[in-house]
């Protein structure tokens, strides 16, 4: 089922994108989202 696999990959990408966008790059957030940028 390529369709089911495509849906799973899409959901994972959306989740990753949402996590990256919600990352504030703070001291605590850096540990949670893997942010490496510094203010």
Swiss-Prot record:
Tissue and organ expression note: In bundles of maturing sperm of larval, pupal and adult males.
UniProt-recorded name of the protein: Gonadal protein gdl-ORF39
């Amino acid at each position: 089922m390529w369709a089911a696999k495509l849906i799973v990959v899409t959901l994972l990408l959306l989740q990753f994108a949402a996590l990256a966008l919600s990352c504030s790059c703070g001291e605590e957030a850096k540990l949670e989202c893997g942010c490496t940028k510094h203010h």
